[in-house]
């Protein structure tokens, strides 16, 4: 079963696979890896769309929060799938493991490597855009009845108007303080988000390096399988040739 099979709709979640099968068999581990890759690929597509929205009129704090949650979700999927793939690889080195399973696991490792590359690209683009652009926020404003421009400020007017002007000024100062505090919070949140992206980029990079070693190791194992098959085929062909020559020699003796 390959990653392409799962894209046709036969993927299952990691959790459901564990609950149904118990995760105890070799096949379950391979299924978990395939399911994880499918989920990562789907989530990375969503992540790409969200990243492309950064810097547009749709770039809001709500979108940044959704982007943050999606990024964390993918990161956890990557860790879980990487662990399962290592488990499958260790199993493949045991004696008596089906050669077909080894080949399937090797293909899944390459699929995992490809989808990780896409996620890394999206991560770097997200870090770049979140650094450059700030989300659009709706700033609070005073009701029109409180704007000082509409109030007669002459001292000989009614005390009610003077009281209204004082209240208007107070409201403006409160809003100004709130806006400053809000902007500081937005800046702090952006900086924290960028730091989290950089940290996750580092984590995924380490997983990618480990995966490259695993893919190389599995490639050697697949080459060994191919060599073994070729040698077996050559030995079989040679054996048949010997039998034919022996039969011909026997026939000549009988004649």
Swiss-Prot record:
It is a single-pass type IV membrane protein. The modification N-acetylserine is found at residue 2. Residues 184-246 form the t-SNARE coiled-coil homology domain. Coiled coil: none annotated. Residues 1-31 are annotated as: Disordered. One of its GO terms (biological process) is vesicle-mediated transport. GO terms for cellular component: membrane. GO terms for molecular function: SNAP receptor activity. May function in the docking or fusion of transport vesicles with the prevacuolar membrane. Belongs to the syntaxin family. Part of the t-SNARE complex. Interacts with RGS1. This is Syntaxin-23. It comes from Arabidopsis thaliana (Mouse-ear cress). The lineage of its organism: Eukaryota, Viridiplantae, Streptophyta, Embryophyta, Tracheophyta. The gene is SYP23.
């Amino acid at each position: 079963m390959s990653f392409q099979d799962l894209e046709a709709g036969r993927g299952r979640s990691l959790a459901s696979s564990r609950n149904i099968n118990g995760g105890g068999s070799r096949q379950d581990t391979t299924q978990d890896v395939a399911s994880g890759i499918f989920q990562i690929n789907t989530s990375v597509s969503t992540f790409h769309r969200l990243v492309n929205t950064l810097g547009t009129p749709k770039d809001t704090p709500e979108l940044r929060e959704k982007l943050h949650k999606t990024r964390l979700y993918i990161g956890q999927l990557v860790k879980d799938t990487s662990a399962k793939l290592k488990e499958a690889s260790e199993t493949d080195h045991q004696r008596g493991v089906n050669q077909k399973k080894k080949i399937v696991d090797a293909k899944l490792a390459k699929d995992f490597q490809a989808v990780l590359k896409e996620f890394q690209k999206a991560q770097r683009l997200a870090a770049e855009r979140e650094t450059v652009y700030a989300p659009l926020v709706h700033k609070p404003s005073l009701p029109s009845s409180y704007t000082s421009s509409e109030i007669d400020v002459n001292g000989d007017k009614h005390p009610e108007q003077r009281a209204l002007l004082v209240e208007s000024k107070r409201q403006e100062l409160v809003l100004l303080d709130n806006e400053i505090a809000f902007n500081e919070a937005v800046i702090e949140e952006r900086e924290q988000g960028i730091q989290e992206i950089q940290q996750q980029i580092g984590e995924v990079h380490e997983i990618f390096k480990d995966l490259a070693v695993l893919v190389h190791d599995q490639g050697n194992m697949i080459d060994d399988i191919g060599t073994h098959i070729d040698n077996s085929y050559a030995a079989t062909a040679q054996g048949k040739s010997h039998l034919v020559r022996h039969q011909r020699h026997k026939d000549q003796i009988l004649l």
